[in-house]
Amino acid sequence: MIITTSRKPSQRTRSLVNDLARVFNFKILNRGKIPLSELIENKDDMIIVEELKGNPGRLKIFNFENNKILSMNLSLKLQREVSGKAFKNSGKLGSKFDKNTEHLKEFFFEYLFKKLSNYKEENFEVVITFKTVDESTFYIEVHKGSENMGPSLKIKTVKILDIE
């Protein structure tokens, strides 16, 4: 899976891309002047981190099998802000949903987890936790054991969009 940014990303956006690439073992594509239409034509599974007011503000996960996009508005804390260090996941990755985020499990499996070679249903070393803040907001955090390794994403909205 490829992760990239909108054009001319800020340092904070590039840091988020690097953090996500380390946790999920994504390949980073430095976009430069590549138009979005050209990225979509390749039909490679990808994630685009978009900016709002100079900070990472939206994450779009493309699913070309269904011609859909999982779009999330977010705020975040980077790895260096959460744990003070860069964490590289070299093991198996799993997920854990609380009762209020359980309804999102199939979306994240369909759009993200089933495309990861290191994702396992059990016997994993690193867990992606989904926990509720209130009825409209939840966190996605990366934990190794009981330690939060970062990044920590506060998801404000989740939408399913059509690829045009």
From Swiss-Prot:
Keyword tags: Ribosome biogenesis
Record-annotated disulphide pairs: none
InterPro entries: Brix (IPR007109), Brix_dom_Rbsml_bgen_prot (IPR023548)
GO MF term set: rRNA binding
Domain Brix: 1-164
Any one of the GO BP annotations: rRNA processing
Transmembrane segments: none
PROSITE patterns given in the database record: BRIX (PS50833)
Function: Probably involved in the biogenesis of the ribosome.
Protein name: Probable Brix domain-containing ribosomal biogenesis protein
Species for this entry: Methanococcus maripaludis (strain DSM 14266 / JCM 13030 / NBRC 101832 / S2 / LL)
